[in-house]
Design a protein with these regions (language model features):
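Short, glycine-/Ser/Thr-/acidic-enriched flexible segments
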Residues: 22, 42-44, 66-68, 95, ...
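Beta-strand segments within the central parallel beta-sheet cores of soluble alpha/beta enzyme folds
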Residues: 64, 219-225, 253-263, 290-295
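Short coil/turn connectors at secondary-structure junctions
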Residues: 31-34, 57-59, 85, 92-95, ...
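Gly/Pro-rich active-site capping loops and adjacent beta-alpha segments
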Residues: 3-6, 105-125, 147, 205, ...
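Flexible, low-hydrophobicity surface segments
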Residues: 1-141, 251, 306
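Alpha-helical support elements that line or immediately flank enzyme active sites
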Residues: 37-62, 96-116, 184-225, 232-252, ...
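Glycine-rich and small/hydrophobic secondary-structure elements
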Residues: 77-106, 233-285
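Helix-loop-helix junctions that connect adjacent transmembrane helices in secondary transporters/permeases
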Residues: 68, 131-213
């Protein structure tokens, strides 16, 4: 029996340090084409019109009209669309895909697409959200989840306290900075759609595909490729590019690869939540802390995602 203090090699150790590991961008099935995402350039607005150019032969667009069932990513609150329809709620929100055999041609097409917006004032901070009035997105309140916990007789400790020390701390967004960006390959054989990619939670993508396509498990396959870092950044978010490549593969009957550029990934993927933390510490005559009242407010961004789980 080995000692529990002895180091062991991970099963993927040799391939990763030698550079032999095959990641999603390294895979090129026969007949594969590429996809790029056209995203919102404004933080919040109504979409008034989308003008697309005449597409070269073999190139096509995928948007919300290609979703046969529900245009939603099922997480906790089911509030985030797969593609924006009438409104965008953050810079980088996906509106459509442009797909084809040459990346350079795809980028040229994207440059010619014109989107007309009607701006809406965005809410960009916790303080702004708290000062909002109806109509609210979730029920009759400016927040979508609220938890309270208490241990011991707090009120009695407050009465005994001789002084109170109050502190406020703020944390900002944190980017996971995984080496491999969000990347997916979708394939369709006429009956089953297969999505391979960089992810942490394959069954999140399975559920998203079931909701979007209206199919059962027998027609959906999701494979986690060797993942070049994630750190929480590839939990629920890969459902979006996962459904995107599936829709493109079904439409084209060809394998479709979607790999985010670094700037694109940082701009549009989920982050560690910014927070405001207020702590009131109650001290007795010996300056021992006998109670604490802690309030943590977390910025969930444009959509709820896994915010309630993180909090």
């Amino acid at each position: 029996m080995n000692k529990i203090s002895e180091s062991i090699k991970r099963y993927d150790f040799e391939d990763k340090i030698s550079g032999k590991a095959i990641y999603t961008p390294d895979v090129h099935p026969e007949g594969m084409i590429y996809a790029k995402t056209l995203r919102s350039k404004v933080p919040r607005a109504k979409i008034l019109s989308i003008q697309t150019p005449t597409l070269p032969e073999g190139y096509f667009i995928v948007d919300h009209n290609d979703i046969p069932e529900k245009n939603v990513i099922p997480v906790v609150f089911d509030d985030q669309p797969i593609f924006a329809t009438d409104e965008v709620n953050y810079i980088g929100e996906p509106i459509l895909l442009v797909c084809g055999s040459e990346k350079s041609v795809i980028l040229e097409i994207m440059d010619k697409i014109i989107i007309e917006y009607q701006p809406i004032k965005p809410i960009v901070s916790i303080e702004e959200a708290q000062s909002c009035r109806a109509p609210f997105i979730f029920k009759q309140q400016p927040h979508f989840v609220h938890y309270e916990y208490q241990k011991g007789n707090f009120d009695e400790c407050v009465k005994r306290a001789k002084r109170v020390i109050s502190d406020e701390f703020r944390t900002g967004y944190q980017e996971q900075a995984y080496l491999e960006t969000q990347s997916m390959i979708g394939d369709y054989d006429g009956h089953t759609v297969c999505v391979r990619g960089s992810m942490q939670c394959p069954y999140y993508i399975v559920e998203s595909l079931k909701v979007a396509l209206g199919w059962d498990d027998s027609r959906i396959r999701v494979i986690q490729m060797p993942t070049g870092g994630a750190f929480g950044g590839k939990e629920e978010y890969p459902s979006i590019p996962g459904v995107h490549v599936a829709l493109a593969a079904i439409k084209s009957k060809r394998p479709v690869q979607l790999v985010y550029e670094r700037q694109e990934d940082i701009q549009c993927s989920t982050k560690r939540h910014p927070t405001i933390i207020r702590i009131n510490s109650y001290l007795d005559e010996s300056d021992d802390i006998i109670a604490r009242d802690i309030e943590v407010k977390s910025d969930g961004g444009a959509y709820a995602g896994l915010s309630s789980v993180v909090l």
